[in-house]
């Protein structure tokens, strides 16, 4: 199949809407990362996503909508917590896991009795949903295990062939996938950190948001993934990545000791020139927002440069930085050295 990459025009929006109605795949920009969309109600269409990505089918997908009225049939109930969070953060990079409704395909939900739903803020996604009338399932538009793409060229690098259309909306603003929170049960639970933080949700809800252990640790054998990004190696370049936890002086000393051909540094802005190895900087120290915006592009650039071993500066573990750490520790296959 020849994959077209088209700029955002009324004609390309109409083509994307038509393809989705016909059960085809479309890659398109969101505020978080580029996604591959298919009609969430059409199991055969959704199977094409798993095939295109090489993604295991026990990994659930998120359903995207453009209005609260679209929740009907997708979820069986909208808990009060969900209404509060939607009022505060929708449209935006927040996914809520709710009881599943009858219209969502089993394939979309990986057979679970819950479904993750979000209302993206990106105008292109909203236009495509409105014009197609399709609530679509959409994971990130990368081959499974690789860093998520935040622009159309990186999307094409992974998806040239398996789908007919990529809409080019430029760079994504956030740079990491949406926050995922389960809003049923005794307490809300953060399943995947993102741009909407634990602290922000607690301020809206007036109660504690628990943090799933799987955010910072591997899932245990036999444990079910309730959200994308909880299972399998994710976000990884070809190089072996190790996170070095400690201040810059100790980081620099460790990198100097282990410098060799093929070794690269993934560091914060302004640090690379002080290191004896090639480097890529991925945002300001203590600034999770800039780190999130640059992380996936930095990981893909390491592949383009042929890096074999990467020593990464360790982000913090609160606010948006928790999302950066969550993605980076999976890219590193949980290799962390405390200095």
Predicted features along the sequence, with ranges:
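Active-site-adjacent structural elements in enzyme catalytic cores
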Residues: 1-339
């Amino acid at each position: 199949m020849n994959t077209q990459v088209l700029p955002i025009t009324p004609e390309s929006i109409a083509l994307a809407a038509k393809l989705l109605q016909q059960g085809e795949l479309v890659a398109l920009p969101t505020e978080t990362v580029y996604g591959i969309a298919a009609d969430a109600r059409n199991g055969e269409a959704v199977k094409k996503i798993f095939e295109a990505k090489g993604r295991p089918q026990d990994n659930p997908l998120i359903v995207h909508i453009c209005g609260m009225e679209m929740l009907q049939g997708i979820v069986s109930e909208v808990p009060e917590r969900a209404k509060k969070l939607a009022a505060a953060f929708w449209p935006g990079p927040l996914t809520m896991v709710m009881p599943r409704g009858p219209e969502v395909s089993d394939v979309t939900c990986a057979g679970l009795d819950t479904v993750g739903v979000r209302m993206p803020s990106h105008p292109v996604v909203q236009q495509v949903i409105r014009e197609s009338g399709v609530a679509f399932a959409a994971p990130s538009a990368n081959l499974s295990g690789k860093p998520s793409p935040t622009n159309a060229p990186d999307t094409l690098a992974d998806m040239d062939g398996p789908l007919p259309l990529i809409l080019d909306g430029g760079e994504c603003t956030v740079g990491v996938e949406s926050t995922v929170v389960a809003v049923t049960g005794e307490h809300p639970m953060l399943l995947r950190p993102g741009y909407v933080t634990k602290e922000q949700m607690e301020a809206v809800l007036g109660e504690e948001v628990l943090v799933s252990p799987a955010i910072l640790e591997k899932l245990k054998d036999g444990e079910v993934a309730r959200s994308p990004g909880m299972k399998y190696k994710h976000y990884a370049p070809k190089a072996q990545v190790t996170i070095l936890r400690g201040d810059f002086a100790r980081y620099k000393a460790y990198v100097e000791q282990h410098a060799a051909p093929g070794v690269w540094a993934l560091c914060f802005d302004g640090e690379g020139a002080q290191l004896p190895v090639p480097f890529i900087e991925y945002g300001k120290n203590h600034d999770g927002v800039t780190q999130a915006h640059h992380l996936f592009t930095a990981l893909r650039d390491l592949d383009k440069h042929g890096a074999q071993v990467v020593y990464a500066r360790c982000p913090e573990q609160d606010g948006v930085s928790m999302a950066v750490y969550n993605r980076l520790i999976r890219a590193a296959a949980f290799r962390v050295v405390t200095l």
